[in-house]
Every structure is written in C-alpha cells, then in structure tokens.
C-alpha cells in the first residue's frame, strides 16, 4: 500500500475511539488532514474541536465543525495527532508543521492522546528527522550555540513564523537515547517556547498504518 493509503487507513480507524457528542482535540499534519476529511462525512459525531493550528482550524471550519477555545472548556477527553517519528515507548518528534507548542498544550490537557501515523514514522531511537524548537526570535543565536554544545546541528527554518509569532530552529545530528532528559534540558534554555520532543507527555495509544492493516500499540 502507498503511504497516503496507510494514512487514510488510520484516519478511518481512529474514529472508533471517539465518544459521540464530545469535543476532541485535533492536531496538524498530513495524516491529520486525512482524518479531517473523514470527519467531513461524520461531522455530527462530535460537538466540536479544539485545534492546534490556524491551518487545521481553517480546514475544520470549512467542513462545518465548531471550534472551541481550550481555555473555555472544562475537560478534553481525546486528542488526535500525528508524528514525524515515534519510538516503541510512544515518545515522538513532532513539529514539522511548526505547530508544536499548541500541540503540546492540547496533549497535556487531554485525558487520552492517540497518535495516528504510517509505518514509515516508526523508529527504535528518535533523531533521524530533525528536532524542531520554537523560540523567541531574539534568542536564536544563543539557543543555536547551546544546541551545538550538546552535539546538535541547528538550522534556522527560513520564512516560517509560527501561529504564536515565533521562529523555528531544526536540530540535526541527534541520537536521542534519553528523550525525557533532552526534552527537559532544551526546555530549560531561556528563549525556548517549546521543543518538539513529546516524551514526558507521550501518546497513550498509537495507530500505525501498515501493509497488513492497522497496528494498535499501547
């Protein structure tokens, strides 16, 4: 099966985990876009959504899904998002779409976090893809130097401003053997808004699209 077909497969499967009438959190990315397509055919299943990005918000509004402000709802039962990489412990690298900070906030709020991805995103050790860091613009040089000290190769993501008005540094050349430790270390640098390691708050369930069907990992 082609990658896009695998993404559609998990996008359809995750519907089984939605409580009818609930407000759900929705992330950002190509696999999530397929999930939003699925929602367009069953939009009465949910009451509305909390969105992690302006892009996803626009897509959801286009199909008539009400958008809720996270700060104005009492609880969020479910958050559905994709990943750039995911390891066997369900820790992830996310942020290729520059929405990592809002994704982290929604993930931290949700009772359950389901990651939907195709099998190409599975790795034993995180770090094959660059690790995004959202930073305050004036901290760019400082944080780049700190990243070099820990063995990373920082690269400024040109022509990208996040929905929060910040910039992104992508970090190459990392072999992330202790994701929680690295997440905490990078978050401690002044000027870091958020790092795209989802290790402390990892996924609760992963639905992985494979050529033999959907693999469910807890």
Swiss-Prot record:
Query: Can you name one GO molecular function term for this protein?
Result: ribose-5-phosphate isomerase activity
- Name any Gene Ontology BP term: pentose-phosphate shunt, non-oxidative branch
Q: Which reaction does it catalyse?
A: aldehydo-D-ribose 5-phosphate = D-ribulose 5-phosphate
Organism (species): Buchnera aphidicola subsp. Baizongia pistaciae (strain Bp)
Which keywords label this protein? Isomerase
Question: What gene is this protein translated from?
Answer: rpiA
Q: What's its top-level EC category?
A: isomerase
Keyword set includes Membrane: no
**Listed GO CC annotations:** cytosol
S-S pairs? none
Q: What is this protein called?
A: Ribose-5-phosphate isomerase A
């Amino acid at each position: 099966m082609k990658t896009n077909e695998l993404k559609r497969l998990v996008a359809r499967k995750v519907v089984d985990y939605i409580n009818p009438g609930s407000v759900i959190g929705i992330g950002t990315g190509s696999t999530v876009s397929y999930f939003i397509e699925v929602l367009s055919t069953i939009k009465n299943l949910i009451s509305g959504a909390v969105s992690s990005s302006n892009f996803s918000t626009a897509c959801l509004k286009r199909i008539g899904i009400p958008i809720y402000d996270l700060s104005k709802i009492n609880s969020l039962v479910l958050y559905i998002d994709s990943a750039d990489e995911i390891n066997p412990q369900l820790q992830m690298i996310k942020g290729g779409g520059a929405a990592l900070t809002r994704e982290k906030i929604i993930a931290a709020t949700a009772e359950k976090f389901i990651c939907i991805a195709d099998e190409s995103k599975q790795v034993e050790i995180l770090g094959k893809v660059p690790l995004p860091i959202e930073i305050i613009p004036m901290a760019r040089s400082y944080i780049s130097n700190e990243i070099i000290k820990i063995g990373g190769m920082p690269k400024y993501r040109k022509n990208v401003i996040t929905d929060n008005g910040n910039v992104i540094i992508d970090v190459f050349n990392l072999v992330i053997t202790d994701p929680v430790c690295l997440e905490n270390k990078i978050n401690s640098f002044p000027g870091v808004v958020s790092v795209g390691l989802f290790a402390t708050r990892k996924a609760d369930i992963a639905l992985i699209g494979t050529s033999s069907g959907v693999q469910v990992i807890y």
